[in-house]
């Protein structure tokens, strides 16, 4: 039975709050009169997904189809979230990816997606003990918890009113009848739900600081524990004369140092074991620390924070950020008693599993696969592991079932010929993906994190296998992707579909490389850095330095002029409000005898001077003038009506009320950061800024007066376009699609916009209507890269939340006849003679010469 959401299916939870001193709340159900008790929601009631999910939106859906972009695949994993993993069966893993929950089949690698209901992000996911349901706790103003059935993925229940801004954690009790949720700032609300009836049973403020976790006791379902920043709290659901109450007792650290607590578990007898930031375990009884547990020799139980504690089938497991899982003797822990004033008790683990030095575990969950128990673990270094914790001679080895980038994606590039893309991140890896078959093909790791990346155009490398990558230590590496099966004498021997080879490495900068760009003819390669320099190289088989120039600020972006411009120039955008333009330097023509510093390159500067305050002032003056005119028009109309009725009206001027003073012109002390920009014509360019000056696209032009010190310049844009809803949500990335003219904007809040371009030149009218969708995480998913595939069939975005998404720009019916219906990758062939070359010697030390 499937229905539209019914009024009587919606809860009306109490909005009552609690003082910190009175930490109990009476059940809302017990306070209702008989006439107030709601009708029971039938077991067979379902919502329709189309009514629940947050889809794309168009400001004018007559002109812009909401199917302009179709979500295709998720390549990333937000592995640095505290808990972002659930197992629904032996081969299906679920995790949050921006505004989607991804359910991935580990065998077939296929994915299913569930969108958030509000488009404001997702705070937690948790599976029901039966695996027949899972809960999705969302973010945003008065967010929902949506319960879905599995495997049908139908929305079953929607819980409302449990927190103000975001849910951070949720847990079902052992029998699955109740759900506990906890919210973020400002309310930190703990709510106990009768989730099948969408009813709030109990609620209380959990604490006055960040709460990380809530969990029911496995043995006593009337007990719960919450923990977080500098605290742990023990809760009981108690039946009193006035009804069911939630009573909380704050744990007291006593002589033990206060710790943030991310992990705990209640033992069968009611004691609680928690982790600490320094790696030891604390045994709590009656709200007090009974003992602190460490290893023999006063070694901590883990090197670093304990991220999870699990009590399973009589065994106690601790999971550490150090990549180790240890199994402890439950009896020893439960009966531990202090022997001296230190309060420390030493013990040895019964068994342990160390996954490696570059592994950092956040969470693990158990699933039965063909009646065999396996654990799946979330590794914040960018992996999901399958583990066997039976610790016997038949135990399976740990298996990495998926690998990903760890942390935000810094840069992305696409092949000029085929459906290959490359990404890099501060996790020190470069990854190659086939976005036709939705698969990761190859990974190469280096000593420092990647910060910039560009795929060499066809004019530079006709095979399409060359990629330039910049790193946080100022290095630039030229790598090549090739099909190893095409190497001489390697038929059938290659394990990988694509391999990556380091071709060249050089260090042009003393700080992180932030931008890389090839000149349109492919003769010159430019690199920009936080060290306020731009370095130029000649593009040959081996890149050779031409020299560098100094610029007024850390480099944010580089863009060479398009082929339509008469002269080849480089637009250099600096973080601190400067734009610089230089011609392409000619190799051998620069005065770089003693150093590589180019001092005679003609340079034009633009130092952005804020005009937003003046725009706002002009808008306010215009608003007041319009208001006056409307009032005068209404007055004259009234006089006319009175006279038509034969009444005498004295036509006197109304006394003007005293106006509020106009706001003063404001110029921010700190210059607003330039986020992105692009050429519009020779010497002209558009800018998007953050900070105070967000909210507009600014059209700017280099002047020919360059005698003045750049620092003293005050250059104003000559035109502006107000961009709707961007005052607090600036545009960070802009990219264009030419076949179906579109301008794509990647926003700070992780949303994606597409503006149809009816004419070449941008204007207020052209950028009035747009398509948008919240795709990346709203809080930390700022879009850091957008690019179209070589044939403009796909759009790819990457974000600060570690996610990489692909979208289809055409449906199957819309694909032009000249293009194949299916995307099939063609891996570039290896360079002739590659198999005979010695491996390129990498630069490994951070102190290498610039």
Regions found by a protein language model. Give the residues of each.
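Beta-strand-rich domains and repeat architectures in extracellular enzymes and scaffolds
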Residues: 72-100, 121-123
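Surface loop/turn motifs at the tips and blade-to-blade linkers of beta-strand repeat domains
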Residues: 74-77, 114-118, 159-163, 204-207, ...
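Solenoidal tandem-repeat scaffolds enriched in leucines and small polar residues
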Residues: 179-277
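Conserved strand-to-loop turn within each blade of WD40 beta-propeller repeats
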Residues: 137-141, 182-186, 226-229, 275-278, ...
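Canonical WD40 repeat/beta-propeller blade segments in eukaryotic WD-repeat proteins
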Residues: 80-85, 120-127, 164-172, 209-216, ...
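Terminal intrinsically disordered, low-complexity extensions flanking WD-repeat/beta-propeller proteins
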Residues: 2-4, 8, 12-15, 19-29, ...
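Per-blade loop-tip surfaces of WD-repeat and WD-like beta-propellers in eukaryotic adaptors/scaffolds
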Residues: 103-111, 142-157, 164, 186-202, ...
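Structural hallmark of WD40 beta-propellers
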Residues: 90-92, 111, 131-136, 143-144, ...
């Amino acid at each position: 039975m499937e229905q539209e959401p019914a009024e009587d299916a919606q809860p009306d939870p109490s909005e009552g709050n609690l003082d910190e001193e009175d930490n109990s709340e009476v059940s809302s159900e017990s306070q209702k009169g008989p006439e107030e008790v709601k009708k029971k929601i039938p077991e067979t009631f379902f919502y329709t997904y189309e009514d629940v999910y947050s889809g794309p939106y168009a400001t004018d859906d007559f002109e812009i189809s909401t199917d302009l972009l179709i979500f295709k695949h998720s390549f990333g994993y937000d592995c640095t979230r505290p808990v972002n993993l659930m197992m629904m069966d032996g081969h299906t893993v679920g995790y949050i990816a921006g505004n989607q929950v991804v359910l991935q089949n580990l065998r077939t690698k296929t994915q299913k997606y569930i969108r958030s209901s509000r488009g404001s992000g997702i705070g937690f996911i948790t599976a029901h003990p039966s695996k027949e349901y899972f809960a999705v706790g969302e973010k945003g103003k008065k967010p929902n918890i949506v319960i879905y059935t599995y495997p049908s993925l139908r929305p079953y229940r929607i819980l409302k009113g449990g927190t103000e801004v975001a849910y951070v954690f949720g847990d079902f009790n052992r029998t699955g009848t109740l759900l506990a949720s906890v919210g973020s700032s400002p309310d930190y609300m703990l709510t106990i739900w009768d989730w099948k009836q969408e009813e709030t049973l109990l609620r209380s403020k959990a604490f006055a600081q960040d709460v990380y976790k809530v969990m029911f006791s496995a043995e006593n379902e009337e007990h719960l524990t919450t923990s977080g920043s500098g605290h742990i709290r023990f809760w009981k659901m108690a039946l009193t004369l006035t009804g069911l109450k939630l009573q909380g007792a704050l744990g007291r650290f006593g002589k033990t140092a206060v710790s943030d607590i991310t992990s705990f578990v209640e033992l069968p007898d009611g004691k609680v074991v928690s982790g600490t930031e320094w790696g030891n375990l604390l045994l709590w009884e009656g709200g007090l620390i009974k003992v602190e547990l460490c290893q023999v020799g006063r070694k901590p139980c883990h090197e670093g924070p304990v991220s999870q504690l699990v009590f399973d089938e009589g065994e106690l497991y601790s999971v550490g950020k150090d990549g180790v899982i240890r199994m402890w003797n439950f009896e020893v822990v439960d009966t531990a008693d202090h022997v001296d004033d230190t309060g420390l008790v030493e013990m040895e683990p019964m068994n342990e599993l160390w996954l490696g030095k570059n592994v950092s575990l956040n969470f693990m969950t158990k699933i039965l696969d063909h009646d065999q128990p396996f654990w799946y673990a979330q590794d914040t270094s960018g992996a999901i592991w399958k583990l066997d914790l039976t610790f016997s001679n038949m135990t399976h080895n740990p298996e990495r079932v998926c690998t990903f980038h760890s942390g935000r994606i810094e840069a992305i590039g696409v092949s000029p010929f085929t459906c290959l893309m490359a990404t890099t991140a501060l996790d020190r890896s470069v990854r190659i993906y086939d976005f036709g078959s939705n698969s990761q093909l190859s990974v190469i790791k280096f000593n420092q994190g990647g910060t910039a990346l560009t795929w060499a155009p066809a004019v530079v490398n006709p095979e399409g296998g060359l990629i330039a990558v910049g790193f946080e230590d100022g290095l630039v590496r030229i790598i090549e992707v090739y099909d190893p099966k095409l190497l001489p004498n390697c038929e059938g021997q290659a394990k990988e579909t694509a391999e990556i080879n380091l071709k060249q490495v050089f260090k042009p900068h003393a700080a992180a490389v932030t931008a890389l760009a090839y000149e349109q003819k492919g003769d010159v390669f430019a690199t920009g850095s936080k060290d306020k320099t731009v370095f130029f190289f000649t593009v040959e088989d081996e890149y050779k330095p031409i020299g560098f120039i100094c610029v007024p600020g850390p480099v944010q972006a580089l863009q060479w002029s398009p082929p339509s411009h008469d002269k080849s120039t480089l637009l250099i955008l600096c973080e601190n409000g400067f734009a610089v333009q230089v011609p392409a330097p000619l190799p051998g023509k620069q005065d770089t005898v003693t150093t590589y510093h180019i001092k005679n390159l003609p340079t034009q500067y633009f130092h952005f001077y804020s005009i937003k305050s003046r725009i706002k002032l002009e808008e306010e003056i215009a608003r007041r003038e319009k208001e006056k005119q409307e009032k005068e028009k209404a007055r004259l109309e009234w006089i006319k009506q009175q006279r038509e009725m034969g009444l005498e009206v004295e036509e006197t001027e109304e006394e003007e009320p005293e106006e509020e003073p106009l706001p003063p012109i404001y110029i921010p002390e700190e210059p607003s950061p330039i986020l992105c920009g692009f050429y519009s014509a020779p010497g002209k360019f558009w800018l998007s800024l953050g900070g105070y000056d967000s909210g507009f696209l600014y059209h700017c032009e280099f002047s020919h007066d360059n005698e003045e010190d750049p620092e003293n310049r005050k250059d104003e844009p000559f035109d502006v376009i107000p961009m709707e809803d961007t005052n607090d949500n600036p545009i960070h990335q802009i990219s264009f699609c030419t076949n179906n003219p579109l301008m794509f904007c990647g926003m700070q809040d992780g949303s994606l916009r597409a503006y149809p371009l009816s004419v070449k030149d941008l204007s207020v009218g052209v950028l009035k209507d747009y398509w948008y969708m919240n795709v990346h995480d709203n809080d930390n998913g700022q879009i850091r890269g957008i690019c179209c595939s070589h044939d403009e069939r796909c759009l790819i975005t990457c974000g600060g939340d570690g996610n990489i998404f692909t979208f289809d720009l055409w449906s199957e019916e819309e694909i032009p006849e000249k293009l194949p219906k299916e995307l099939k990758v063609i891996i570039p062939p290896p360079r002739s003679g590659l198999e005979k070359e010695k491996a390129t010697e990498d630069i490994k030390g951070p102190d290498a010469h610039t």
